[in-house]
Amino acid sequence: MKIHCCRIVICVLVAVVLTGCASAPLSLWQEKAPARVALVEYVNAVTDRGSADYIPVERRIAVFDLDGTLFLETDPTYFDWLLFEHRVLEDPNYRATAEQTAVAKASRQGKFPKLDKNRERLVSEAYRGMTLSEFDAFVRKFMQEDQPGFTNLKRGDAFYLPMIEIVDYLRKNGFTVYVISGTDRLTVRPLTKILHLPPHQIIGSDSTIVSDRQGNRDALDYIYTRGDQLVLGGKNLVKDLQMNKVSVIVREIGVQPVLAFGNTMSDASMLNYTINGNPYRALGFMLLCDDLEREYGNLKKADRMRRDCRKYGWIPVSMRDDWKTIYGDQVKIRKKAPALKKGSQEK
């Protein structure tokens, strides 16, 4: 009953943020936080028809990274990799390969693989043959599990409430919001239902999708017909990080964003593309993982990112200093932080 009640509290908090019931814009932020002040001033200027900085509604495009920007990425690592571990080690309906099992067991001990093509191959292959609805249900079920490093938090609820507040604030001011994630698109869609964004505004990495009757035939040689069912093909096509984020923005949005939010150097190209050579006033924000009390932060990484913000002209967002809460006050971090060993995943 206690867990059920806590989940209700989280849902109510999110509902308050998304319905604008808070008394002031960005009320979960410290009022004088530099990032909040900069964003509110910017939005006021670009939405004022009498301002020299006015941006027409159709050009008000904001892009957000997911992991570490909108959503937890440090307990102990990315949602998509934890989903892979679950698939390989705990799903009775899946027969994992020896390679998948060895890698998943090693990662349970904190030895995470690098974010390279081999990692993406392993992840994609783990879901080969699943229908789109089966995979969607698999993700949603995993979202209902407890977040191990926190009390009173489910995996699917691990969103940064102050950042959800920004998404809603921008939408209320005529911005179109896109999520540009390195996580697979079909994983991100159910995970981000909380944002109430249409599927075409959720962009992520891509793997092949094929017909269940296609066999080994190339997509150019196969005609989809009545009775075919779409299944995951098990081959990664693109990892949506760094320059690939810029490419996907050009291909799928077709408009240069005016706001960009990220948290690591894998988002650097997206932020720099946003703020450089833009016909409109534009800003880029980078989150600093500097909170050790309410989140599994890393001060060394945070200090490095703060230096990068000065170098590239990004606005730093301090999770520790700028936010009144992260997941809601009912959520508490467990005492022992999960340690990331040498060679751990980092975007």
Describe every region a protein language model picked out:
Residues 1-9:
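Bacterial N-terminal signal peptides that target proteins for export
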Residues 60-75, 271:
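Asp-based phosphoryl-transfer active-site loop
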Residues 72, 80, 187-188:
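Short catalytic/ligand-binding loop motif for oxyanion handling, primarily in non-cytosolic enzymes
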Residues 59-64, 100-109, 166:
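Amphipathic alpha-helical surface "interface" segments used
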Residues 24-30, 37-40, 44, 59, ...:
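C-terminal cap/substrate-recognition subdomain and adjoining C-terminal extension
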Residues 13, 20-66, 81, 92-94, ...:
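Non-catalytic pre-domain segments flanking phosphatase-related domains
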Residues 48-50, 71-73, 211-213:
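Short, solvent-exposed loop/turn elements at domain surfaces
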Residues 75-78, 82-157, 161:
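A metal-dependent, Asp-based hydrolase signature
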